[in-house]
Amino acid sequence: MINKNEWLTVGLITSCHGINGQVKVKSLSDFEERFLKPGMRWLQKENEPPSKIELISGFKQPGKETFIVKLQGINTRNDAEQLKTFKILVRTDKLPKLKKEEFHLLELINLEVKTLENDELKTIGKVINLENEKNNLLIIELFKNQKKVLIPFVKEIVPLVDIKNQFVIINPPNGLLEL
């Protein structure tokens, strides 16, 4: 379950765009309105506390998962360059409500990872983090050797997610856990 006082990173400011203080944001969210709809947002630099800032406008770059965003008080290219590597956050208690079988990716962290071997479920590790570039990847730490492996989060490899009972079942191709 999601802790109500936590933050979820939904975007990363990767660079400035133009000379009027716009920034380029790499989306880590399925909800585009987070970068399009004006309103208050939260920014975080490295491990500093998040701070409020108002999103004035935004648009999605055609054919990409990036957005060009204008933030209140960021009016020059130099201002925008200062925000490079900042995270755009939302509070986990403000996450959209989902349908019964849906879940937020953040809820996968700390779930046990199980495989089906000889008709028995065997716990092999836990999800310690997520990576989201073009595809979602689960970062799993294996119990047997504390090795970290990346597992593509696709139905063929992760056929079952059980948030209520705190585990996922994976069906990795041969050799994936040995990489």
Curated annotation (Swiss-Prot):
Q: What are the entry keywords?
A: Chaperone, Cytoplasm, Ribosome biogenesis, rRNA processing
Q: Which GO terms describe its biological process?
A: ribosomal small subunit biogenesis; rRNA processing
Q: List the record's Gene Ontology CC terms alphabetically.
A: cytoplasm; ribosome
Q: List, for all copies, the residue spans of the domain called PRC barrel.
A: 100-176
> Could you name the domain of life of the organism this protein comes from?
Bacteria
The protein's assembly and partners: Binds ribosomal protein uS19.
Q: What is this protein called?
A: Ribosome maturation factor RimM
Q: Which family does it belong to?
A: Belongs to the RimM family.
- Described purpose of this protein according to its UniProt entry: An accessory protein needed during the final step in the assembly of 30S ribosomal subunit, possibly for assembly of the head region. Essential for efficient processing of 16S rRNA. May be needed both before and after RbfA during the maturation of 16S rRNA. It has affinity for free ribosomal 30S subunits but not for 70S ribosomes.
* Underlying gene: rimM
The domain section of the record reads: The PRC barrel domain binds ribosomal protein uS19.
The cellular location(s) given in this protein's UniProt record come to:
Cytoplasm
